[in-house]
């Protein structure tokens, strides 16, 4: 089972500014088993308020679930 996690722009900026990367209107799938989140940009179109983003630069693909939202539960 997969769950979409839509992140708030200011929250993303706060959590990822240490990487000098600002990700706006992006969505990720979060797995409760392995604790990782992966960007799945094309699936963002499921929610009308989300704008898909393409990443022209190298982005860290795996983020620990607790770094994003400890309340989120989903599975690979």
Swiss-Prot record:
Lineage of source species: Eukaryota, Fungi, Dikarya, Ascomycota, Saccharomycotina
Similarity comment: family membership: Belongs to the UPF0377 family.
Protein source organism: Saccharomyces cerevisiae (strain ATCC 204508 / S288c) (Baker's yeast)
Protein's name according to its UniProt entry: Putative UPF0377 protein YGL260W
